[in-house]
A protein has these predicted regions:
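Non-catalytic terminal and boundary segments that flank Rossmann-like NAD(P)-dependent oxidoreductase
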Residues: 87, 135-161
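SDR active-site lid
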Residues: 42-112
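Rossmann-fold scaffold of SDR-type NAD(P)-dependent oxidoreductases
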Residues: 6
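Residue(s) in the substrate-gating loop at a strand-loop-helix junction
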Residues: 9
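Active-site helix of classical SDR
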Residues: 25-28
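Active-site-adjacent segment of SDR/Rossmann-fold oxidoreductases
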Residues: 14, 35-46
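Short-chain dehydrogenase/reductase
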Residues: 114-125
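Active-site loop immediately N-terminal to the catalytic Tyr-X3-Lys motif
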Residues: 14-20
Length: 161
C-alpha cells in the first residue's frame, strides 16, 4: 500500500506554443499515471497527479530561441514571455502550494486522481475543453499581438498581455 504522487502540469491536458517537448512529456506522464493507477489499485497503491499552472520559478528564463529560429518564432517567444510574466505576477503558483497539496494527498484516505492547482490552470483547461483544439489552432493564425491578446482576454476573462 502507499501513494505515488507525480508532478505533471496543465500542459499535460492542453498544448502551449513553443512548449511541444514539455507538453509531450506531461501528456505521457498523465497517461502513464492513469494507467498505473488502474494496475496497482488492487495492491492498495494510489497514484495521484498534481497539475499546477504557471509556477513561480526561474525555469522560463531558459527558453531562449536558437538564432536560426528567431526569424520564424520570435513573435511566439515574445507572447510566451508576456503571458508567463503576467501569469507569474498575478496568478502563478508558489512551489510551497505544491508541497502543501502533496501533504494533503499523503494524509488523505481517499485522494482524487487529479489536483489541478491554481485558477489559471483550471481556466486554461476549462476553456480548451469547451472551445476545442480548433479554436486554439485558429488563434495561432493571429499575427497582430493586440488582436491576439484581445481574443485571449475574451476567451479567458482576464488580461494576459
Amino acid at each position: 500500500s502507499g501513494t505515488i504522487i507525480n508532478i505533471s502540469s496543465q500542459a499535460g491536458r492542453r498544448p502551449f506554443f513553443l512548449q511541444g517537448p514539455y507538453c509531450a512529456i506531461k501528456y505521457a506522464l498523465n497517461g502513464l499515471s492513469e494507467t498505473l493507477a488502474h494496475e496497482v489499485a488492487k495492491f492498495g497503491i494510489r497514484v495521484v497527479l498534481v497539475e499546477p499552472g504557471v509556477v513561480r520559478t526561474p525555469i522560463f528564463g531558459k527558453n531562449a530561441l536558437p538564432d536560426e529560429d528567431k526569424e520564424h518564432y520570435e513573435m511566439l517567444q515574445s507572447r510566451t514571455v508576456r503571458m508567463i510574466t503576467k501569469g507569474l505576477m498575478e496568478t502563478g503558483c508558489d512551489p510551497i502550494d505544491i508541497a502543501k497539496c502533496m501533504e494533503e494527498i499523503v494524509v488523505s484516505e481517499n485522494p482524487k486522481m487529479h489536483y489541478l492547482l491554481e485558477q489559471d490552470a483550471r481556466d486554461n483547461i476549462r476553456v480548451y475543453d469547451e472551445d476545442g483544439p480548433e479554436a486554439w489552432i485558429e488563434d495561432g493564425k493571429i499575427e497582430d499581438d493586440d488582436e491576439y491578446f484581445k481574443v485571449q482576454k475574451e476567451r479567458y476573462g482576464y488580461d494576459l498581455s
